[in-house]
Amino acid sequence: MNKSVVTNKGTVEGIEKGGYVVFKGIPYAKAPVGELRWKAPQELDAWEGTYKADTFQNMCMQELPKAEHPFMGRFHKEFYNNPEFVPGMGEDCLYLNIWVPEHEEGERLPVAFWIHGGGFGGGYSSELEFDGEAFCKKGVILVTINYRVNIFGFFAHPWLDAENERHISGNYGILDQIAALKWVANNIENFGGDSKNITVFGQSAGSMSTQVLCSSKLTGDIPAKAIMQSGISCDADVLYTPTLKEEEEIGERFIGLTGKTSLEELRAMSTEELFEAKVKLDDEMWKTGRGLVVVPNADGYVLEKTVKDVWKEGTMKDIPYMCGVVTDDLGATPEEVKAGKTGILMEECKRWAATREEKGTPAYLYHFAHELPGDDWGTFHSSELWYTFGTLGRCWRPMEQQDYDLSEEMVTCWTNFMKTGDPNGETQIQEEKEKWESYTKENPYVKIFK
């Protein structure tokens, strides 16, 4: 296996593992610090020599879940309790990681491009539950990325509009994702990947980001397929993309909390000062019942229209899709799903699939209903991630053989879809497995993982 690869900016050297090579912490854009804070990602300068891609780099600035928090404490216990998988933090954070399976020279492997969740306020590319080994065993390259989040990634304000040639602001985190996706499209063939077979997938805010990328003209024809896990917006009010004007109103509130009177003063603020104002803004928004508000916006450029309008017009990318939920996303049991009684997020998935049927491209729907072993929490938001990445061995829970069997089935379905656009693949996992049909009005099939 070749652990040294030449990219368009220089040579990178990864770490050889059993059957694959992992490249950790490859920069895909300049560090967005100083004058580059709240600007679109800037192209890297070329480097000389070999970049040692052997360490996961900084996560982007965020407030990590605390163990004592009444709600987020459960996420700390589940995903953030191992210091080995919690890297440093800083504004210098635009890095990606690549897991490459052993392959023949000249072979072009399918590529999975993962966008983490975290409510557009947190999360990072090297979380405990993310790893590419299981995908590599199936012959798929995995890429995971960092992107700016919270006030660093989605702050919109007229001051920022004024310095932008398109008079827009706020979508820096999405522009990071697009820059990373284009970096992959431009470089992945040197790693053995197929630049024409890239599947964009994500969970929660990462799923919503996937919908944005599939609704934006800036991504062109790069995404060949997409998977949206627990986060899609068609007609309901649960998830939304505000207009630029609406997001600028949030920005005005944030400015008031900082006490600053110019963009220069804002860029001179320390991360600690910015976070203090951000926490105040979050508290204010939650008290008024508005919840998550520092999010991507329809600025007329990154998103010409809101994702809901794009869905209504049917102008999202015309590619195969997979989308689904876990039980606690929607408050419905598997029995209710079979009886046609589903919650909001599953209804959104069905609306999306109906639009795909009209366009003649498939959409595959699923419901993850497996109760995780352990003394708490059941089938919770994000619980499927251990299974889709095949990382059960890292989890604190007393996993049993049925958990490993379910994970094997899900990894196989996900990677089959990434290869061919069909989760069933060329061969079934087991002869007795029921075929996963695409969703149509005549056959509203939802695959249940339990």
Give short role names for the model-derived ranges.
Residues R148-N150, F201-A205, H367-D375, I429-E437:
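Short, solvent-exposed turn/loop segments enriched in Gly/Ser/Thr/Pro and often Arg
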Residues V21, E91-L94, L175-I178, K182, ...:
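A structural signal for well-ordered alpha-helical segments within the folded catalytic domains
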Residues K225, S233-Y240, L257, T261, ...:
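Substrate-gating cap/lid region and adjacent catalytic-acid/histidine neighborhood
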Residues E431-K450:
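C-terminal domain-tail junction helix/linker
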Residues Y28, W47, L385-Y387, K447:
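Bulky hydrophobic/aromatic "packing anchor" residues in well-ordered structure
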Residues F79-K260, W311-L330, E358-T361:
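Serine-hydrolase-like catalytic core of hydrolytic proteins
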Residues E264-M269, E426-K435:
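Short, flexible loop/turn segments with low-complexity composition
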Residues M1-N171, S195, T288, Q401-M410, ...:
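Non-catalytic accessory segments of hydrolases
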